[in-house]
Structures are given as structure tokens and as C-alpha cells.
């Protein structure tokens, strides 16, 4: 339940901004990662199960989900923040699965703060072409 709730918090921000990986996606990624991690810790399995190998496979699987969210349109690359959010949602689920509840809650708060508060700062200082110097040459302005 904790992993699901943490995924919902991150997914809520993504959903609010209209990104494709929203509430359901982030909640499922966090809950699934927690479940796989927790299953690896059950001592009753007939074979020896290494939880770190399960964690590595979670990271690999989530990498495919993240890669699917990244789109390139000309020189514009979209979806990197969503891909990173998917990656973090999985790590939060794994942290909860390993029993690091407070770490997962703390990181979730930090992630939501970064997603919500840095967007206006980034747009103001780094993406506004109106504030660039006239002598700055952009790649699309170079002579052919």
C-alpha cells in the first residue's frame, strides 16, 4: 500500500501536467517493483533467491518502459522527465519492498518538489529564447 501511494503522488504530478505516464502507470510501477522485491525476500522459496538479482531485473524492465516514453521530434527530445519519473517510481517500490519506508517517503517528497517547483525556474532561465544574447548562435542558425 505504501509503494502504491508513493507512486500515486508522483503520478499525480505527471497526470496534472498531461503526460502519458500518470496516476495508474506510476502506481502500478511502484507497486509491482515492491511486490517483486518482497517476493525475493521470502525465505520459503524452494530455491535460493537473490533479491539483488531481482532488483537488477526490475531496473532492466523499467528501462524499457522509460525508453518507450522518450520521443524525438527533430532536435526536440520529449519525455526524459517522464522516463526519469518511471525509474524513480520503481526505485521507490524497491525501497519499500526492502523495508526502507522512511527513505522512500523522503525521496518521494523530494521528487514531487523537484517536479513541481523546478519547472517554472527551468522555463524562466533556460528555455526562454527571448533572453538570449543576439550574438549567441543556435545550431539551426549555422551556415551550411
Predicted features and spans:
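Membrane-helix interface "capping/anchor" motifs
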Residues: 16-21, 70-82
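Small-residue-rich segments of transmembrane alpha-helices in multi-pass membrane proteins
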Residues: 28-38, 60-63, 84-97, 138-143
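Alpha-helical transmembrane-segment detector that highlights a single hydrophobic TM helix
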Residues: 47-70
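Canonical alpha-helical transmembrane segment with a positive-inside/aromatic-interface signature
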Residues: 100-144
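Short glycine-rich loop/turn motifs that provide flexible caps or phosphate-binding loops at active sites
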Residues: 6, 10, 21, 31, ...
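Alpha-helical transmembrane segments and their membrane-interface boundaries
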Residues: 1-54, 101, 121, 139-144
Amino acid at each position: 500500500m505504501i509503494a502504491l501511494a508513493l507512486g500515486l503522488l508522483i503520478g499525480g504530478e505527471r497526470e496534472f501536467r498531461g503526460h502519458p505516464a500518470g496516476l495508474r502507470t506510476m502506481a502500478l510501477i511502484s507497486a509491482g517493483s515492491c511486490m517483486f522485491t518482497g517476493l525475493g525476500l521470502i525465505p520459503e522459496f524452494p530455491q535460493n533467491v537473490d533479491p539483488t538479482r531481482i532488483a537488477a531485473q526490475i531496473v532492466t524492465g523499467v528501462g524499457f518502459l522509460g525508453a518507450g516514453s522518450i520521443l524525438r521530434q527533430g532536435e526536440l527530445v520529449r519525455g526524459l522527465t517522464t522516463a526519469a519519473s518511471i525509474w524513480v517510481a520503481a526505485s521507490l517500490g524497491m525501497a519499500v519492498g526492502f523495508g526502507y519506508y522512511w527513505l522512500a517517503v523522503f525521496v518521494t517528497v523530494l521528487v514531487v518538489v523537484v517536479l513541481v517547483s523546478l519547472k517554472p525556474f527551468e522555463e524562466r532561465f533556460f528555455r526562454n529564447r527571448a533572453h538570449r544574447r543576439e550574438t549567441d548562435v543556435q545550431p539551426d542558425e549555422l551556415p551550411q
